[in-house]
């Protein structure tokens, strides 16, 4: 399930309408949306059932998806920008970094998708697995 639509991405590019004649076609934008929706699922699937369906969570993930697609399109458009290429690529990479930071914080549990369905912790015959990191201290009895 895609987290964004062509119209959502189009709203970010006021001076460009995606068609079959533009440097980035509408079909390519839809492919980018599908690809980045799968990337998002990969990042959040360790904590939440995917695809995420909660309304508030969908709104957040839509913004992340749009940002990732926007970054990809800006990098493609920057190739033909001449002198402005470096600054446009820098902006595109900053947009991508912000979106990826959100996904990392969701994966680590620092950012919560309040209305998304949480995955149950995995149990095995050897023990209980959760997202907590083990802490081992030097020169201290821990058992």
Residue positions per predicted region:
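Conserved short "hinge" loops at termini or chain/domain junctions
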Residues: 1-61, 118-143
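Short loop/turn elements at secondary-structure junctions
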Residues: 71-143
């Amino acid at each position: 399930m895609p987290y964004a639509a062509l119209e959502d991405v189009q709203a970010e590019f006021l001076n460009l309408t995606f068609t079959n004649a533009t440097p980035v076609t509408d079909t390519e934008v839809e492919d980018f949306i599908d690809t980045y929706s799968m990337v998002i699922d990969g990042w959040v699937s360790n904590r939440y059932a995917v695809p995420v369906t909660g309304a508030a969570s969908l709104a957040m993930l839509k913004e992340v998806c749009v940002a990732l697609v926007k970054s990809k399109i800006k990098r493609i458009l920057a190739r033909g920008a001449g002198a402005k290429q470096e600054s446009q690529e820098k902006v595109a990479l900053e947009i991508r970094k912000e979106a990826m930071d959100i996904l990392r914080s969701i994966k680590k549990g620092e950012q919560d998708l309040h209305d998304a369905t949480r995955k149950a912790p995995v149990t095995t015959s050897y023990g209980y697995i959760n997202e907590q990191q083990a802490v081992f201290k030097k020169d201290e009895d821990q058992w």
